[in-house]
């Protein structure tokens, strides 16, 4: 449960994932949670996973990756929509690990995906990194 929805004064940072088929309301639910977080005075960022990885790739190219990562780390609730909808490479895998690792215990994350959670390990692909990233969501 995301306690910041019910008790915004609690300094607890919960994460949640929602997986189901297209059109089942995952994005609607994630955005509703984000909207409530905004009403409770929290900063929220909604981003589709493919766009996030594209943006971070551009940040690598222009040298602003660390700055962007720091900015995302300050967001109270990060909503990553459509996770695992497109293949990722080693760079995206590392970016995901850094992004999630920066948020553990200090900020909340909501992830939506059509891919069941038990298949995320295969999607992420690198056996040295797949456990920490998915365990923290």
Regions found by a protein language model. Name each.
Residues 16:
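Conserved beta-strand position immediately N-terminal to the Walker
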Residues 7, 36-37, 102-103:
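Hydrophobic helix-cap positions at the C-terminus of alpha-helices
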Residues 77:
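Walker B motif beta-strand of ABC-family P-loop ATPases
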Residues 6-13:
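Phosphate-binding P-loop
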Residues 19-42:
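Walker A/P-loop
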Residues 1-5:
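N-terminal pre-Walker A segment at the start of P-loop NTPase domains
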């Amino acid at each position: 449960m995301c306690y910041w929805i019910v008790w915004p004064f609690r300094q607890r940072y919960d994460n949640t994932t929602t997986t189901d088929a297209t059109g089942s309301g995952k994005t609607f639910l994630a955005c509703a949670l984000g909207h409530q977080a905004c009403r409770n005075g929290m900063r929220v960022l909604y981003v589709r996973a493919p766009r996030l990885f594209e943006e971070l790739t551009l940040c690598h190219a222009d040298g602003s990756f660390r700055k962007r990562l720091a900015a995302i780390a300050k967001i109270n609730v990060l909503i990553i929509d459509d996770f695992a909808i497109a293949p990722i490479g080693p760079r995206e895998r590392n970016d995901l690990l850094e992004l999630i690792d920066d948020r553990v215990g200090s900020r909340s994350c909501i992830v939506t995906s059509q891919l069941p959670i038990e298949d995320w390990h295969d999607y992420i692909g690198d056996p040295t990194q797949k456990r920490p990233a998915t365990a923290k969501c």
